[in-house]
């Protein structure tokens, strides 16, 4: 019984980290912390990288919202 409980606890700790690591795509978001940031679509279109197509990442834009953007290497 204790072994089963310990195993379930171990999966509860490890599994969420594994899932979130799979959702993040390589590359980095463009820098919007500039004196005049590039403006983007002023609405949120994503909440995580997996919401975006192919190589795009979910990044902040110049309006303060999250949108799918081409990732920088």
Curated annotation (Swiss-Prot):
Which Pfam families does the annotation name?
WAP
Q: Does the keyword Metal-binding apply?
A: no
Query: Which top-rank group of organisms is this from?
Result: Eukaryota
Q: Which SUPFAM superfamilies match?
A: Elafin-like
Q: List the disulfide bonds.
A: 29-59, 42-63, 46-58, 52-68
UniProt subcellular location? Secreted
Question: Which Gene Ontology terms of cellular component type are present?
Answer: extracellular region; extracellular space
- In which tissues does this protein get expressed? Expressed by the venom gland.
**What GO biological process terms are annotated to this protein in UniProt?**
defense response to bacterium; transforming growth factor beta receptor signaling pathway; venom-mediated disruption of cell wall in another organism
Q: Where is the signal peptide?
A: 1-21
Name all WAP domain ranges: 22-72
> What's a single GO MF annotation on this record?
transforming growth factor beta binding
InterPro entries per UniProt: Elafin-like_sf (IPR036645), WAP_dom (IPR008197)
| This protein's UniProt keywords | Antibiotic, Antimicrobial, Disulfide bond, Secreted, Signal
General function of this protein:
Damages membranes of susceptible bacteria. Has no hemolytic activity. Not toxic to mice. Does not inhibit the proteinases elastase and cathepsin G.
What's this protein's family per the entry?
A: Belongs to the venom waprin family.
List, alphabetically, the PANTHER family matched: ACP24A4-RELATED (PTHR45938), WAP, KAZAL, IMMUNOGLOBULIN, KUNITZ AND NTR DOMAIN-CONTAINING PROTEIN 2-LIKE (PTHR45938:SF11)
What protein name is recorded for this chain? Waprin-Phi2
* The species this protein was found in: Philodryas olfersii (Green snake)
